[in-house]
């Protein structure tokens, strides 16, 4: 029974990672809107960073726990494939989702980085204009 509990924990940690990556992706969309909005405040931008930072920390914790448990149950999964066929298939599907979401998040991060560079370049130009006019 303990082995089945470990396998369930593995699956649940992958499900949680999918959930967290979806949250990060949604927050990236919010961050993109904030960066594109000339009236957005620095606090709004910082809130998106803070949210993502928390979720990234949660993912790191999940990954560490997953690795530790996987090492314990890897032989079991290899030796009893028929017994765990459904769980293995579900976990493979979750890993595919995680890969797709990770790729999506990385793309969003690159796009937001470019938006941030543009926004901060505009802020610098405004600051220079103000200094010159004084």
Regions found by a protein language model. Name each.
Residues 15-18, 29, 53:
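N-terminal intrinsically disordered, cationic/polar leader segments
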Residues 58, 62-87:
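Helix-adjacent hinge/juxtasegments
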Residues 1-13:
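Disorder-to-helix initiation segments
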Residues 43-53:
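Short, charged, amphipathic alpha-helical segments
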Residues 81-134:
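Short terminal interaction segments
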Residues 24-31:
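A broad helix-preferring feature
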Residues 31-39, 73:
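Secondary-structure edge/capping motif, primarily at the C-terminal ends of alpha-helices
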Residues 20, 54-69, 97-108:
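Amphipathic alpha-helical coiled-coil segments
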